[in-house]
Amino acid sequence: MRVGVVVFPGSNCDRDALHAVERAGAEPVELWHADADLKGSDAVILPGGFSYGDYLRPGAIARFARVMGPLEAFAREGGPVLGVCNGFQVLCEAHLLPGALLQNRGLRFVCRRVRVRVERADTPWTAACAPGEELTLPVAHNEGNYFADPATLARLEEEGRVVLRYLENPNGSANDIAGVCSEGRNVVGLMPHPERASDPLLGSGEGLGILRSVLAGAKV
């Protein structure tokens, strides 16, 4: 399986994501922001960082990058897409996921490990996890405070589209939401960084299950 990792100007987690994809057993494919196609990728990751310097607001400019055209078509056809941190923000700006990521409660950058609970194991990106499984994953963000209007939040809960939930909310996210998925469940956005917890040598391998999920999860 080929897993593409999109590189925007200002991305800084793309190398981590490419390395983690390889460790998960897939073939990593680097996708440049100006690419006109996805190079035959079977799944795509939008990594963390500060795309285009986070000017205007995080993800607002990246949403218009050339590669986003084929990526949006891929997602709407059911292709597995994962947005991590800034990638989650880009997916919200592209309207592939509902809601928005606001500045953290407390107005400070949060950089630490957090405990999250897997709420849904029926997405391509959580198929190797168990419902209710608890993971410790790193977060590193200034705008990770998930927000949606009350009707959207109610719909996400009713439709089972909250994928990860914080056990100790680090940023003020509504309903302790750490990740959500699209109606088709193929597009997932997470604020925690599974790729930074993919090698026990670096402190944790707990995020590797999320990246390995797509190998089996592509069939979900």
UniProtKB/Swiss-Prot annotation:
Biological-process GO terms, alphabetical: 'de novo' IMP biosynthetic process
Keyword Translocase: no
CC per GO annotation: cytoplasm
Catalytic reaction annotation: N(2)-formyl-N(1)-(5-phospho-beta-D-ribosyl)glycinamide + L-glutamine + ATP + H2O = 2-formamido-N(1)-(5-O-phospho-beta-D-ribosyl)acetamidine + L-glutamate + ADP + phosphate + H(+); L-glutamine + H2O = L-glutamate + NH4(+)
Principal location: cytoplasm
HAMAP family from the UniProt entry: PurQ (MF_00421)
Function noted in UniProt: Part of the phosphoribosylformylglycinamidine synthase complex involved in the purines biosynthetic pathway. Catalyzes the ATP-dependent conversion of formylglycinamide ribonucleotide (FGAR) and glutamine to yield formylglycinamidine ribonucleotide (FGAM) and glutamate. The FGAM synthase complex is composed of three subunits. PurQ produces an ammonia molecule by converting glutamine to glutamate. PurL transfers the ammonia molecule to FGAR to form FGAM in an ATP-dependent manner.
Self-association state and partner proteins as the record states: Part of the FGAM synthase complex composed of 1 PurL, 1 PurQ and 2 PurS subunits.
Protein name, as recorded: Phosphoribosylformylglycinamidine synthase subunit PurQ
